[in-house]
Amino acid sequence: MVRGKIEMKKIENATSRQVTFSKRRNGLLKKAYELSVLCDAQLSLIIFSQRGRLYEFSSSDMQKTIERYRKYTKDHETSNHDSQIHLQQLKQEASHMITKIELLEFHKRKLLGQGIASCSLEELQEIDSQLQRSLGKVRERKAQLFKEQLEKLKAKEKQLLEENVKLHQKNVINPWRGSSTDQQQEKYKVIDLNLEVETDLFIGLPNRNC
C-alpha cells in the first residue's frame, strides 16, 4: 500500500503531532550519527520540542563545535564587512574620477573655443591666460628641440672635418703610395719586359763564316 504524501503544515492534533515529532526526531538523530561516522564530519544537532525539552547530538564536544561556529561566522562577517568597505571606497574613487574627467572635458571644450558664448569676461580672460601659458610651453619645447638638432648637426660636422683632416695627412705622408694591386701589376710588367729581352737574345742561329 502506497503511503500518502503528508502535507507540509502544522499538525493540528496534539497527539498526532507528538507521535510525528518522536519519529522524525529519532530519524534525524540517526541520520546525524551516520553522517558523522561515514563522512568523518564534525556535527552537532540541537532540538527543542514544543514543550521546551532539549534533545541534542554531537560527534565531538558540543561546546567546541559551537565555539568553532561562532568564530567562523565572526570571521565571515568581518570579511564581508571589509569587502563592503573596500567596495564603497572603490565606488567613491570611481565617482571622483568621473567628476574629474567631466571637468577636464569641460575645460578642454573651452580651450578649443566651444561653448564660450555663455562665458563671462573674467572666464574669457582666464581662458586667454591658459592659452598663452600653453603657447609659451609649446614654443619653449620647440626651441629646445631645434637646439638639440643643431647640436647634433654640429657634432656630425666636426666628426666629418676630423676624418677629412686624417685623410689629408695620410696623403701628405705617402703621396706616391698606391694600392697593393697597382704595385703587383707594375711588378708583373717589369718581369714581362725582362722575359722579352732574354727571348730576343736567343732567337736565330749563330752566324758562321764559310
From Swiss-Prot:
The keyword Translocase does not apply. It is found in: Nucleus. Its main location: nucleus. SMART domains: MADS. Disruption phenotype: No visible phenotype under normal growth conditions. The keyword NADP does not apply. It comes from the Eukaryota. Residues 1-61 form the MADS-box domain. One of its GO terms (cellular component) is nucleus. PROSITE patterns: K_BOX, MADS_BOX_1, MADS_BOX_2. InterPro entries: MADS-box/MEF2_TF, MEF2-like_N, TF_Kbox, TF_MADSbox, TF_MADSbox_sf. One of its GO terms (molecular function) is RNA polymerase II transcription regulatory region sequence-specific DNA binding. GO terms for biological process: abscission; cell differentiation; floral organ senescence; leaf senescence; positive regulation of transcription by RNA polymerase II; regulation of flower development. Pfam families: K-box (PF01486), SRF-TF (PF00319). MADS-box transcription factor that acts with AGL71 and AGL72 in the control of flowering time. Promotes flowering at the shoot apical and axillary meristems. Seems to act through a gibberellin-dependent pathway. Interacts genetically with SOC1 and its expression is directly regulated by SOC1. Plays a role in controlling flower organ senescence and abscission by repressing ethylene responses and regulating the expression of BOP2 and IDA. Plants over-expressing AGL42 have a significant delay of leaf and flower senescence and a deficiency in flower abscission. This is MADS-box protein AGL42. It comes from Arabidopsis thaliana. The gene is AGL42.
